[in-house]
């Protein structure tokens, strides 16, 4: 299983949002380059970068900073404010390995399916942020302020045959509160859709959580707050996953 240490960027600073709320920001400093370098020195191969400024306002995308982060030698998976093929091409040209597509993956499946076929399944990761409502998981939209009418399974089914290979699913109810990931959800997704590499996101608080996500069939795990709060280190996480 791949560990994706997370760096959330807001106006050049490293932050974490609690449950996606811009009025609930924890600031971890103004040196994202050093954070990325430390992840790499500890053994990380990948880094998961979210451009929160770009997500909130496409005109404020932090392209130059993301390009610099690509020069650290880490493989970069990033998103936030990606709304067009030009946005994807700009990021790929900057050295990004995989571009994350969020709300558009739910609201415009035909366009995103075309991107998957054009750029290849290994260059795009769908970000499907969900909330359980009435026993079903429904995707959230627009920075988690709206809910889609469709279900998570409906969205996944829309990409059958498109080459979709990577998707991350965040259980919004667990994001940023270190309550543990939704293991039952990831186990079901890995079982029902085995051709997709699922990334667990939201709630990871311990090495045991990483072990459980791996046992559930997740191909990757994204962790941010647990690292910044000292619950475990990147080195400990990598060793844990290697020895599991």
Curated annotation (Swiss-Prot):
GO biological process, one term: L-tryptophan biosynthetic process
Entry keywords, A to Z: Amino-acid biosynthesis, Cytoplasm, Histidine biosynthesis, Isomerase
SUPFAM superfamilies per UniProt: Ribulose-phoshate binding barrel
InterPro entries, per the entry: Aldolase_TIM, His_biosynth, HisA_bact_arch, Isoase_HisA-like, Isoase_HisA-like_bact, RibuloseP-bd_barrel
GO cellular component: cytoplasm
Highest taxon of source: Bacteria
Gene3D superfamilies: Aldolase class I
Catalytic activity: 1-(5-phospho-beta-D-ribosyl)-5-[(5-phospho-beta-D-ribosylamino)methylideneamino]imidazole-4-carboxamide = 5-[(5-phospho-1-deoxy-D-ribulos-1-ylimino)methylamino]-1-(5-phospho-beta-D-ribosyl)imidazole-4-carboxamide
EC number: 5.3.1.16
Gene Ontology molecular function: any one: 1-(5-phosphoribosyl)-5-[(5-phosphoribosylamino)methylideneamino]imidazole-4-carboxamide isomerase activity
Protein's cellular compartments: Cytoplasm
Active site: 8, 129
Pathway membership: Amino-acid biosynthesis; L-histidine biosynthesis; L-histidine from 5-phospho-alpha-D-ribose 1-diphosphate: step 4/9
PANTHER family, A to Z: 1-(5-PHOSPHORIBOSYL)-5-[(5-PHOSPHORIBOSYLAMINO)METHYLIDENEAMINO] IMIDAZOLE-4-CARBOXAMIDE ISOMERASE
Family to which this protein belongs: Belongs to the HisA/HisF family.
Name this polypeptide is given: 1-(5-phosphoribosyl)-5-[(5-phosphoribosylamino)methylideneamino] imidazole-4-carboxamide isomerase
Species assigned in the record: Maricaulis maris (strain MCS10) (Caulobacter maris)
């Amino acid at each position: 299983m791949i560990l994706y240490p997370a760096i959330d960027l807001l106006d050049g600073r490293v932050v974490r949002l609690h449950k996606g709320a811009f009025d609930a920001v924890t600031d971890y400093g103004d040196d994202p380059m050093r954070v990325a370098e430390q992840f790499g020195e500890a053994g990380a191969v990948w880094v998961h970068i979210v451009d929160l400024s770009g997500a909130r306002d496409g005109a404020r995308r932090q392209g130059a900073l993301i390009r610099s982060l690509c020069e650290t030698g880490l493989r970069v998976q990033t998103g936030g404010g990606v709304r067009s093929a030009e946005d994807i091409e700009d990021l790929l040209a900057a050295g990004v390995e995989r571009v994350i597509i969020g709300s558009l993956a739910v609201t415009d499946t035909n366009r995103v399916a075309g991107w998957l076929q054009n750029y290849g399944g290994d260059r795009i990761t769908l970000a499907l942020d969900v909330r359980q409502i009435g026993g079903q998981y429904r995707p959230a939209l627009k920075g988690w302020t709206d809910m889609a009418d469709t279900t998570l399974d409906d969205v996944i089914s829309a990409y059958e045959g498109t080459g979709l290979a990577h998707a991350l699913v965040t259980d919004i109810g667990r994001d940023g509160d270190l309550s543990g990931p939704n293991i039952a959800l990831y186990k079901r997704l890995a079982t029902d859709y085995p051709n997709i590499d699922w990334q667990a996101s939201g709630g990871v608080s311990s090495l045991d959580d990483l072990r459980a996500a791996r046992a559930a069939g997740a191909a990757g795990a994204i962790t941010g707050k647990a690292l910044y709060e000292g619950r475990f280190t990147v080195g400990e996480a990598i060793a844990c996953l290697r020895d599991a």
